[in-house]
C-alpha cells in the first residue's frame, strides 16, 4: 500500500505532525475498553497516513480509522466575537489484544 511506503520513509517528526496528540475525554476512556484510541490529527491527514503513523509510532496493528472535523466554537475575545480553530479527530480501531499506553509513550 502506498501509505505504508510513505510512512516508512517519514521521519519521527513527520509522524508526530500527522498524529499530534491523544484526546483524553470521558468518551475516549469508554472507547479504550473496546480497543479504540482517539487522537488529534493534522487537518490535512488522510486515513491511510493516520493508520501508517499510528502503526509505526506505537508498534500496533490498526484495523480501522474513522475521522471527523470538530468545528470551533464562537467565543468572545475582548468583547468581540472570535472563533476557535477547527480540530480533526481520528478514532483508531486496534487489533484484538493490542493496546496503547498513552501515558508512558507521550509523557
UniProtKB/Swiss-Prot annotation:
GO terms for cellular component: ribonucleoprotein complex; ribosome. Keywords: Ribonucleoprotein, Ribosomal protein, RNA-binding, rRNA-binding. GO terms for biological process: translation. InterPro entries: Nucleotide-bd_a/b_plait_sf (IPR012677), Ribosomal_uL23-like (IPR013025), Ribosomal_uL23/eL15/eS24_sf (IPR012678). Gene3D superfamilies: 3.30.70.330. It comes from the Bacteria. The keyword Ribosomal protein applies. Belongs to the universal ribosomal protein uL23 family. This is Large ribosomal subunit protein uL23. It comes from Gluconobacter oxydans (strain 621H).
Amino acid at each position: 500500500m502506498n501509505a505504508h511506503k510513505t510512512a516508512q520513509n517519514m521521519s519521527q517528526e513527520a509522524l508526530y505532525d500527522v498524529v499530534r496528540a491523544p484526546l483524553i475525554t470521558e468518551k475516549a476512556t469508554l472507547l479504550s475498553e473496546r480497543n479504540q484510541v482517539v487522537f488529534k490529527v493534522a487537518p490535512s491527514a488522510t486515513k491511510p497516513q493516520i493508520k501508517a503513523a499510528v502503526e509505526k509510532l506505537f508498534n500496533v496493528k490498526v484495523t480501522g480509522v474513522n475521522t471527523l472535523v470538530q468545528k470551533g466554537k464562537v467565543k468572545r475575545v475582548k468583547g468581540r466575537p472570535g472563533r476557535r480553530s477547527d480540530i480533526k479527530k481520528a478514532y483508531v480501531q486496534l487489533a484484538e489484544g493490542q493496546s496503547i499506553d498513552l501515558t508512558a509513550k507521550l509523557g
